[in-house]
């Protein structure tokens, strides 16, 4: 069957359902596809179809994730739903499912629970900009005041983690009721999607951001100079533009891109996603290496000390058999290179067990081009034992 062309006429947004186990995330995902399918904007996916999430591998970690897509009048959405709590933690920290916004599902029968809080914290750490709330199972609560209390609790919780608790849309509904076609609850799903359309900002496309390309390989063309190859991570680069070589050394070095080529063809410019070779003026083979990045001057700096949110793999996932402690020195893999670093655990945390999610300080032995939101893996003897996201650089 021929593949359908991807429709670029609508802005594309990545969202996901988050919240405590059994509060109705997957049922809500199914309900959204059903309500939008009736308007011609989706293909209906039932609960079993979404819950039976395929395994994916990201940074050497197996994650179960379901992806569904649907359209509203204004946007095209890719929606992720994870069956288990650990899958959310891994998904968000590895960036396997980049989220431009979240739908926080809270059962009105229960109110906020431990994973509700944990998912909000994770969303804050990995930089999810906005959260819309869906109070589910409202058909099972007779007392309106009870729902008011739950809403207040959720708003307070969002505010506690620096989200807009006062301004966030909170929709009351029943995902199961909507799946069963009850008009009142179908209307709640329509209200939810209108809120998502309006409240969650359209993300800046990768190609509109500032230029950055991790260096994967370096070689010399006799008579022409040094070429750095890699995949453009974001932004665009034109021939004769100035770039900086950043990382592994304290001082960034400026140079000019005098030529670009892809698949042996010359280019005037390259953009996010392109695998290119960049010819660099006045740079000798020894002064650039894999693990550095080419970037728009002044946009990224090399750092050795950072705060990070880290997930330690379980033994079954190929992680460590035993916990690690303060001053642990593994390899930290950023973009294209491994650098040794030392782990400094927060006060009160003596050790990190396989399967734990922890905030820590990392001190690298060499400076690396990193910024808030940069993803990395933690490796030991060539195998991945953890994944992390930079929360802040120091």
Swiss-Prot record:
GO cellular component: cytosol
Binding residues annotated for Mg(2+), in chain numbering: 26
Region (G2): 60-64
Subcellular location(s) of the protein: Cytoplasm
MF GO annotations: GTP binding; GTPase activity; translation elongation factor activity
Ranges for region G5: 174-176
Record-listed GTP binding positions: 19-26, 81-85, 136-139
PROSITE patterns registered for this protein in UniProt: G_TR_1 (PS00301), G_TR_2 (PS51722)
Subunit description: Monomer.
Family indicated by similarity: Belongs to the TRAFAC class translation factor GTPase superfamily. Classic translation factor GTPase family. EF-Tu/EF-1A subfamily.
Protein name per the record: Elongation factor Tu
Organism of provenance: Mesoplasma florum (strain ATCC 33453 / NBRC 100688 / NCTC 11704 / L1)
């Amino acid at each position: 069957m021929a593949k359908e062309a991807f429709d670029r006429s609508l802005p594309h947004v990545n969202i996901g359902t988050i919240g405590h186990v059994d509060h109705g995330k997957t049922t809500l995902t199914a309900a959204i596809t059903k309500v939008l399918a009736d308007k011609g904007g989706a293909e209906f996916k039932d609960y079993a179809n979404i819950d039976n999430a395929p395994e994916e591998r990201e940074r050497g970690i197996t994650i179960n994730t379901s992806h569904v897509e649907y359209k509203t009048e204004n946007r095209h959405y890719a929606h992720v739903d994870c069956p288990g709590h650990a899958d959310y933690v891994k998904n968000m920290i590895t960036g396997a499912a980049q989220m431009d916004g979240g739908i926080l599902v809270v059962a009105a029968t229960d109110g906020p629970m431990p994973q509700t809080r944990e998912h909000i914290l994770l969303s804050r750490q990995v930089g999810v900009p906005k959260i819309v709330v869906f109070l589910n199972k409202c058909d099972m609560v007779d007392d309106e005041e009870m729902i008011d209390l739950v809403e207040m609790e959720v708003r307070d919780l969002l505010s506690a983690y620096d989200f807009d608790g006062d301004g966030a849309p909170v929709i009351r509904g029943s995902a199961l009721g909507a799946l069963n076609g009850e008009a009142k609850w179908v209307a709640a799903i329509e209200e939810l999607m209108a809120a998502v359309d309006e409240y969650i900002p359209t993300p800046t496309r990768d190609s509109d951001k500032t230029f950055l390309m991790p260096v994967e390989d370096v070689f010399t063309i006799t008579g022409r100079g040094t070429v750095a190859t890699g995949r453009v991570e974001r932004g665009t680069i034109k021939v004769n533009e100035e770039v900086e070589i950043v990382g592994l050394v304290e001082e960034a070095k400026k140079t000019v891109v005098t030529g670009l080529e892809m698949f042996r063809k010359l280019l005037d410019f390259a953009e996010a996603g392109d695998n290119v070779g960049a010819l660099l003026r006045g740079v000798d083979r020894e002064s650039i290496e894999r693990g550095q990045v080419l970037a728009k001057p002044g946009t990224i700096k090399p750092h050795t000390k950072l705060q990070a949110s880290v997930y330690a793999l379980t033994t079954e996932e190929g992680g460590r058999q035993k916990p690690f402690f303060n001053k642990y020195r593994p390899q930290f893999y950023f973009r294209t290179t491994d650098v040794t670093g030392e782990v400094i655990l927060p006060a009160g945390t003596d050790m990190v067990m396989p399967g734990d999610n922890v905030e820590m300080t990392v001190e690298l032995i060499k400076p690396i081009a990193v910024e808030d939101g940069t993803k990395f893996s933690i490796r030991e003897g060539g195998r991945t034992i953890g994944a992390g996201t930079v929360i802040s650089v120091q």
